[in-house]
Amino acid sequence: MAFSLPKLPYAHHALEPHIDAMTMELHHGKHHQAYINNLNQAVAGTDLDNKPIAAILKNVSQYDVAVRNNGGGHYNHTFFWAILSPQGSDGPLGEIADAIRQRFGSFEQFKEAFSAAATTRFGSGWAWLYVAKNSELNICSTPNQDNPLMDVVPTEHRGTPILGLDVWEHAYYLHYQNRRPEYIAAFWNVVNWKEVAKRFQQAL
């Protein structure tokens, strides 16, 4: 069973003006597809092509670096499309909102900490909000296509991701050029907090 490109849950232009249609078209149809093609090549003839991608990543230290890079790329982008929405809200509600306030002091303080992690990630990578094994919310950034599920990230950064932001240049350069902070600020307008809340509940 080969891995395949998931369909976007919205049109390429649906996130404008925050994320432009051309970026979405290239990011989803070209970059994400390339990770899938390379992942399928890396797992061909092994038992990995029958495993869920999350299960592979939890033990990714056992596999070739191509599985880490391209498996991470596939998982991360599939995750990213799901936590974006044209109907982005002002912020989280319910238990996830309470957990964010309890951990970070306020939603605004959380946004500042998350945005700082995304802004200061040197080179390519991701910023994450994740549920640690003690059920506490934490923020980290990871290089390349790593994520908190992987057993190759530092122990203190391991857990279940519930919100992520791609800060590779291909995610924003067409529209924002070198203005990464503007892209990060725009991201908050298209976060699907209902999806984040659902993933939070699943991670507990």
Predicted feature descriptions by range:
Residues 1-204:
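Feature for soluble, non-membrane regions of globular proteins
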